């Protein structure tokens, strides 16, 4: 498992990490999880059009996630829930969590070879205590 947290140099960091992940994948399947601080597509945030130029939803950040997927990693939540609009982060401002104005910026990506083992991918948005909520996957071997 490789955990990441990406910030301003998202694209460059993700490219270097992607090279590492692809080399690691030559030896064993890979699970990548963490706070990517970026929503991938419109379904991954409550107000996509209002946020198109904002950090966390720039073209470069979205392309970074697309590159990860194109390299053969599966977005586990979106794979199992293609149309579900759930979020893993809400701003502390303006009652965002109460009004469910959130973003899905926390991810589990897995190697394609693990797809057959993926049983569940969940966002536990009922769990309070942070601006993020827990996410989980279940793999059965």
Can you describe what each PLM-predicted range is?
Residues 114-117:
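Short helix-loop capping/hinge motifs at secondary-structure junctions, enriched
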Residues 1-15:
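N-terminal low-complexity segments that are often proline-rich with Ser/Thr-Pro
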Residues 109:
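Hydrophobic alpha-helical positions that pack around
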Residues 90-91, 119-125:
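Short, solvent-exposed helix-loop connector elements
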Residues 16-101, 105:
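Metal-dependent phosphoesterases centered on the DNase I-like endonuclease/exonuclease/phosphatase
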Residues 122-141:
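Surface polyanion/phosphate-binding segment centered on an Asp-His-Pro turn
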